């Protein structure tokens, strides 16, 4: 609990300093998906972290309408015996956000946090299908955007164009997920 409080304080201080410099802070309280925990445990820990982060943001007088929140999705651990399905992840994540994120936060940009490209895209789309929400739900993926293009490229100059096409495809699919219009069948197109 002390670590959560200290990290929340550091995030809030960073956000306050950014706003003082007229920079929009990206506040990233990540709960890792490493381990065997179930989705309920992730929900509880994510809720606790978000509550502490917003308490600290308020203490630091951060304007919540001037931040981007970059949290994890509420998801089972990577090594969990029973991983939650797409609709369960989406509904648990939206419920957690609804209970812990003030409506004045304009945008939530999810990190992929070790999910596969397909999982991250499907989860985002499912959440947006459940909308409207008081905040915009979007993506700020690293690995989930880059994994397939890097695999296609494999360091071979002759694969650059195919890798670029793979990146464009993944970006398009996430753009569709952003509006709730992604469908898994699109992976094959």
Where are these regions (language model features)?
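Short, contiguous, pocket-lining structural segments
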Residues: 3-6, 19, 41-45
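Short beta-strand segments at enzyme active-site cores
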Residues: 22-32, 63-72
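Membrane-embedded alpha-helical bundle segments of multi-pass proteins
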Residues: 6, 13, 23, 27-28, ...
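Glycine-rich anion/phosphate-binding loops
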Residues: 1-14, 48
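Substrate-engagement module of ASCE P-loop NTPases
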Residues: 10-18, 53-58
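Glycine-rich, proline-tolerant flexible connector loops at the mouths of alpha/beta enzymes
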Residues: 1-2, 31-37, 78
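Active-site capping/gating regions of soluble enzymes
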Residues: 37-189
């Amino acid at each position: 609990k002390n670590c959560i409080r200290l990290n929340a304080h550091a995030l809030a201080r960073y956000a306050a300093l950014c706003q003082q410099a007229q920079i929009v802070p990206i506040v990233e309280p990540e709960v890792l998906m490493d381990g065997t925990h179930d989705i309920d445990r992730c929900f509880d820990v994510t809720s606790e972290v978000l509550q502490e982060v917003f308490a600290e943001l308020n203490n630091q007088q951060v304007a919540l309408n001037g931040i981007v929140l970059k949290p994890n999705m509420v998801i089972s651990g990577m090594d969990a015996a029973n991983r939650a399905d797409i609709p369960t992840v989406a509904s648990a994540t939206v419920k957690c956000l609804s209970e812990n994120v003030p409506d004045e936060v304009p945008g939530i940009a999810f990190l992929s946090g070790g999910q596969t490209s397909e999982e991250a895209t499907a989860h985002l789309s499912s959440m947006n299908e459940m909308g409207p929400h008081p905040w915009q739900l979007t993506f700020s993926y690293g690995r989930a955007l880059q994994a397939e293009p890097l695999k296609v490229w494999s360091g071979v100059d002759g694969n650059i164009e195919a890798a670029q096409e793979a990146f464009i495809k993944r970006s398009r699919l996430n753009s569709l997920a952003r509006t709730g219009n992604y469908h898994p069948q699109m992976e094959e197109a």
